[in-house]
Amino acid sequence: MWTYPEIDPVALTFGPLQIHWYGLMYLAGFAFFWGYGSYKAKFSDHWTAERVGDFLFYGALGVILGGRIGYILFYDLAHYIAEPLDVFQVWKGGMAFHGGLIGVMVAMWLFARKMQVSMFVVADFVAPMVPVGLFFGRIGNFINGELWGKVTDSSLGMKVYDPTLNMVVSKYPTQLLEALLEGIVLFIILMFYTRSPRPLGAASGLFIGLYGLFRFYVEFFRLPDPQLGYLFWGWVTMGQLLSLPMILIGFALVVWAYRNNRVMAP
């Protein structure tokens, strides 16, 4: 059984300026997107390295604004109404993937209009790179010591201090499980899948469906947010409620793409 290493969430300090690991993880995700996206653009009819850089600006705004607004609306609206200045303390965490997804979808729609192409041209190009950003985000959650799983006596558990119990307990490190499934595994699947021609929209649907499936599964090991608890039947969490439509819509989009879309994405 492992022991949580109690990592300082502040990576660097320059006088009054503090640089947090959580923010650096976002920068790492954006840097990967630019590097890998620029490489992929060499084999695309629609993309160039310059366009990848332009979209990165749109996408970063979508991720940060959508992720923050989504967390506030879906998970802790009452707190932020009472403490509105906490909205700006993003270095403490409090980002929701589902809100970030909506933000990125808006960014992709706007960028597709700018490129004068189908939104799926943008979404299919972006989809394989998103899991690496999710990986870095979950590592940031781990460093911050947040989003722990349930108490367990399993060998997969990690010893961590629980302030609500005022004692050290063993919990599932669900941040690392999400980093593995939603990050590494999903990236590998999409990377190999997008190497071959496929219908336009299929890669986007596969990402949405598999993310929803992986997230729905991990939620069984993860503790619900304390301000929400379980929503239904003593086991359904907000994360599962938001992921279920993703599973249905994502795989339905894959089926639709193969049945109806003759435009093949390279």
Curated annotation (Swiss-Prot):
Transmembrane annotation, as ranges: 14-34, 55-75, 91-111, 117-137, 172-192, 201-221, 235-255
Record-level Gene Ontology MF annotations: phosphatidylglycerol-prolipoprotein diacylglyceryl transferase activity
GO biological process: lipoprotein biosynthetic process
Main localization category: membrane
Keyword Transferase found: yes
InterPro entries from the UniProt entry: Lgt
Annotated residues for binding of a 1,2-diacyl-sn-glycero-3-phospho-(1'-sn-glycerol): 138
Keywords: Cell inner membrane, Cell membrane, Membrane, Transferase, Transmembrane, Transmembrane helix
PROSITE patterns: LGT
GO CC terms of this entry: plasma membrane
Localization terms from the record: Cell inner membrane
Membrane protein topology class: Multi-pass membrane protein
EC number of this enzyme: 2.5.1.145
Pathway participation: Protein modification; lipoprotein biosynthesis (diacylglyceryl transfer)
Function: Catalyzes the transfer of the diacylglyceryl group from phosphatidylglycerol to the sulfhydryl group of the N-terminal cysteine of a prolipoprotein, the first step in the formation of mature lipoproteins.
Family of the protein in this entry: Belongs to the Lgt family.
Name of the protein: Phosphatidylglycerol--prolipoprotein diacylglyceryl transferase
Organism, as annotated: Hydrogenovibrio crunogenus (strain DSM 25203 / XCL-2) (Thiomicrospira crunogena)
Taxonomic lineage of the native organism: Bacteria, Pseudomonadati, Pseudomonadota, Gammaproteobacteria, Thiotrichales
Gene: lgt
